[in-house]
A protein has these predicted regions:
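Outer-membrane beta-barrel channels and translocator barrels
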Residues: 4, 16, 79-83, 130-133, ...
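Extended hydrophobic/aromatic segments used for targeting, binding, or gating
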Residues: 109-124, 128
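C-terminal outer-membrane beta-barrel translocator/porin domains of Gram-negative envelope proteins
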Residues: 4-78, 88-111, 154
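C-terminal beta-signal and adjacent terminal beta-strands/loops
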Residues: 92-109, 132, 140-159, 175
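Outer-membrane beta-barrel "beta-signal"
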Residues: 126-133, 163-177
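Transmembrane beta-strands of outer-membrane beta-barrel proteins
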Residues: 5-11, 86-90, 124, 135-137, ...
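Transmembrane beta-barrel architecture of outer-membrane proteins
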Residues: 67-71, 119-123, 166-170
Length: 177
């Protein structure tokens, strides 16, 4: 089997807007962020929208959805040995709402807040390549958490990591992009 090294880059952008007599998108049509195919430092549906943070700090699948999504992924892939491949990655992205919603403070998209609202994570992955499909195990860590806007430990977990808060483990079938 030939040795390989590659760099893969992915940009994902989505915008959804309610039309007709609807003022809000149906829940199943809204975007979510975090998880094995998004910003891998967050568990699935636990990121955003924007700077939004649930009052009790828990994940809320209903309010952590949005109308706009941006994913930026950079991955370095290499062969390790046998059927095992490795990856190192950096992910950035978030979701936002197009309107202000009382139950999602800090979630509305603004051009001025685009950079400060981006969540950033990094990590390592192990892939088991069976030729017809790939089993993937990724460990991501938050580097910048937009839900915390002050210069405290939670905003920059890269400097002050908390294992229970800032790491996410993912098992998936297939490549992330």
């Amino acid at each position: 089997e030939p040795l390989f090294r590659s760099r893969s880059f992915h940009i994902g952008l989505g915008v959804a807007y309610p039309y007709g007599n609807s003022t809000v998108l149906p829940f199943e049509k809204r975007y979510f962020s975090g998880g094995a195919n998004s910003v891998r430092g967050w568990t699935v549906r636990s990121l955003g929208p924007g700077r939004y943070k649930d009052k009790d700090g828990r994940i809320n699948f209903i309010t952590q959805t949005g109308d706009l999504k941006l994913d930026l992924n950079l991955e370095y892939r290499t062969h390790l040995f046998g059927k095992f491949n490795g990856a190192a990655f950096i992910d950035a992205g978030n979701i936002w709402t197009l309107r202000d919603y009382e139950e999602q403070p800090g979630g509305k998209f603004t051009w001025q807040g685009l950079i400060t609202d981006l969540a950033v994570s990094y990590g390592l992955g192990l892939r088991l390549n069976f030729d017809y499909f790939v089993l993937r195990f990724d460990c991501g860590m938050k580097a910048i958490n937009p839900a915390y806007q002050t210069e405290d430990e939670a905003h920059y977990p890269l400097i002050h990591p908390d294992f229970s808060r800032d790491f996410a483990f993912h098992f998936a079938v297939g490549m992330p992009f």
